[in-house]
Curated annotation (Swiss-Prot):
PANTHER family: 50S RIBOSOMAL PROTEIN L36, CHLOROPLASTIC (PTHR42888), LARGE RIBOSOMAL SUBUNIT PROTEIN BL36C (PTHR42888:SF1). Keywords: Ribonucleoprotein, Ribosomal protein. Coiled coil: none annotated. The keyword Ribosomal protein applies. One of its GO terms (cellular component) is cytoplasm. This is Large ribosomal subunit protein bL36. GO terms for biological process: translation. Belongs to the bacterial ribosomal protein bL36 family. One of its GO terms (molecular function) is structural constituent of ribosome. Transmembrane segments: none annotated. It comes from Staphylococcus aureus (strain NCTC 8325 / PS 47).
Length: 37
C-alpha cells in the first residue's frame, strides 16, 4: 500500500474507488495499491 498525495491508475486493471471519503486505487497487482492521505 502506497500512501501519496495524488493517486493515479498505473495499469489498465487499476480501479479508482472511494472508501470512507478516502480515494484509493485497487488492482490485481498488489504493488499498485494506493491510498490518498
Amino acid at each position: 500500500m502506497k500512501v501519496r498525495p495524488s493517486v493515479k491508475p498505473i495499469c489498465e486493471k487499476c480501479k479508482v474507488i472511494k472508501r470512507k471519503g478516502k480515494v484509493m486505487v485497487i488492482c490485481e497487482n498488489p504493488k499498485h495499491k494506493q491510498r490518498q492521505g
